[in-house]
Amino acid sequence: MRLLFRQDMATVMSLFGISEWLLFGLWVLALVWPISYAIRHRTSLALSITVGLLLAYLVQVMGEFAIDREWVGGWLWWDFVLIPNRIDGGAWFHTLFSAGFLHSRYDPTHVLGNILVIALVGVPLEQRLGMRRFAAVYLIGLFGGSIAWFMFNLDSPIPSLGASGAAFGLFGAYLAGWPKDEIPFPLILIRKWPVIYLALFYFGMEVFRAYTTIGLNQASDVAHMAHLGGFVAAYILLPIVAKGGPYALGVEDGGPTNSSSERSRLNQIKSVMIDMSQAVDPWTARKMDIPRNIRDPLRSLLASADEPDTR
């Protein structure tokens, strides 16, 4: 989550003209369409959020160009960024949610860093949880980050925005559920890393950065408490969200990206399969002798059919 300065803001929705509404509508469409597609077609929600955030960011960049050309006025997203000292009534509570879908248009690494985590960590986590439970975890991280930033900066007039709380929430949830899963991630080297290493590395770095910002009073344009809030909230609530899900907590099969996970699934199927060696052939069922020329092929057929992928 990034911080901005109040002087960047100039307009609110009550002052929108046609151009502003068109640009805002395009931003909503860019964000919502990929997510809607994933829900309707049962594809990866994590990837659709990644695409939606990136497309929405591109619309924000278009908005900056439009502002420079004076096609629209001022800073378009004023009503959707999180400003702690204005959340003193119900009118601004929506910014605890909406700020998580905006990113700093001045720093492309802000959105790129978030979507990298959401894609690489979110996809295997979604495979563990299923779409609905993953959506719940994502929102828990988003709200947890926003609430933490609000609580630690009650009187601050500085706006913040970004999906970092949700991204860190994915780390926290994965650590709570399946810490020994291995997922591909570019940490020093691009290779598979155990989730516990990745999550604790990112969490530890944020604790250090938060200390240097708050404890040592060093300047920072990053809302570190939002990152920590998203991580902790998702970590604490993951056992509740994951209850009754596709995988038991703590299962050690290497993770959804490993072949061991597929073997585990096949073994689970096989455990409830009927033993084909006990199957009754048509001749025996009619109390007839099996013809000699059929006995060996029949025995081979029953043996080869006793696997999940040949049933």
Describe every region a protein language model picked out.
Residues T284-D289, S304-T310:
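Charged, low-complexity interaction regions
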Residues R2-A279, W283, N293-P297, L301:
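A detector for small-residue-rich transmembrane helices and their helix-helix packing motifs
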